[in-house]
Structure formats: C-alpha cells, structure tokens
C-alpha cells in the first residue's frame, strides 16, 4: 500500500513540474524560432501610448510591421488597441499615425480601436478580417507574446504566424525569463 501511495505522489509531483515546463518550453520555442510568412495583413498588437505617442514597446512593434511592409511581406497593417479611460488617443490610432508618418499610405494603415487585452483585440481584428473574407495574418508583437497571440487568433478562425520584435523593452536581447513566465 505504501508503495502505491509513494508512486501516486511521485506522479503528482512529476505532473506539477512537467505541465508548466511544457508550456514554458512552448513559449520559449515560439519566441526564439518564429515562423513568419507573407500575408496581405499584419496586425500590430496594442501597447501603451502617451497622448498619441507610442510607448517603446508599441514603437518596437510598429517598426517591425513597417519593416515587413517595406520588404513586401505584407500589403496592409492593422493596428489594434483601445484607450484607457481619459485618454485622448487609442493605441490603434497612435500606431496608425506613426505608420503614416513613416510613409505607409493611409489606405494601407488601418486602425481598429478595440481591446485592452489580447483576447478582445483579437476578436476585434478577426471580425474585421472575416468581413473581408481574409483568413491569414502576421501578428507583430513581443517574442514571448507570440505563442499566446497566435493561439488565440487560430482559435478564432484565422491562420496566424508571428513576427516578433527584435528590439524594445520586451525583446529577446533583454533575456527576460521573468517576462517569459508572465506570458505563459
């Protein structure tokens, strides 16, 4: 009987370590080895903006999307994200204006001011894409956010790949395992 109890406790202990370890490894792998393909649309996930000026995190995402646009990997860029109560601008509008000032045509920079989190923002842009009968997208976000963002998009019916940022406060060069843990 004691042997059976010890085996059961060992299995529970193994599960406690293995399950979070599996998810941690999935997030880490997606951050370090992204699969990015061309698409008609890129979606820049929202991040803070300060009175219309993108935060460092949002600017890094916008730069990556602009790079994809310049290289011909995407034809249009969607920015998403609502504003906080009292904000004069939304994350989406601040991002769109940044892209336009860099040379992206107004028709190619689309603002969807929906969502203060990944799920709500994803629902907003997926609804927009479905109206256009588009089902593929490249998501531009932080490396450790890629797995979550692509998983939610796929769950909502869109084929998604991720183009993680290479610089910025949440990029891989910061080597932040703390951040990795918070995005699992």
Q: Where do the protein language model's features map onto the residues?
A:
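N-terminal type II signal-anchor transmembrane helix
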Residues: 2-34
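A structural signal for short, hydrophobic/glycine-enriched beta-strand patches
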Residues: 24-174
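Conserved small/polar residues in nucleotide/adenosyl-binding loops
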Residues: 177-181
């Amino acid at each position: 009987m004691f042997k059976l109890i010890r085996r059961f406790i060992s299995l529970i202990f193994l599960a406690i370590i293995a399950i979070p370890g599996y998810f941690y490894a999935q997030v880490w792998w997606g951050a370090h080895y992204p699969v990015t393909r061309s698409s008609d649309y890129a979606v820049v996930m929202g991040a803070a903006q300060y009175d219309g000026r993108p935060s460092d995190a949002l600017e890094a995402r916008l730069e990556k999307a602009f790079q994809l646009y310049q290289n011909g990997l995407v034809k249009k860029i969607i920015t998403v994200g609502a504003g906080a109560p009292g904000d004069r601008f939304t994350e989406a509008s601040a991002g769109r204006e940044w892209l336009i000032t860099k040379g992206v045509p107004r028709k190619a920079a689309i603002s969807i001011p929906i969502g203060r989190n990944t799920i709500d923002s994803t629902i907003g842009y997926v609804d927009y894409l479905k109206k256009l009968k588009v089902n593929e997208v490249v998501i531009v976000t932080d490396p450790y956010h890629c797995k979550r963002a692509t998983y939610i998009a796929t769950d909502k019916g869109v084929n998604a790949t991720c183009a993680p940022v290479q610089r910025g406060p949440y990029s891989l060069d910061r080597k932040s395992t703390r951040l990795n843990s918070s995005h699992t």
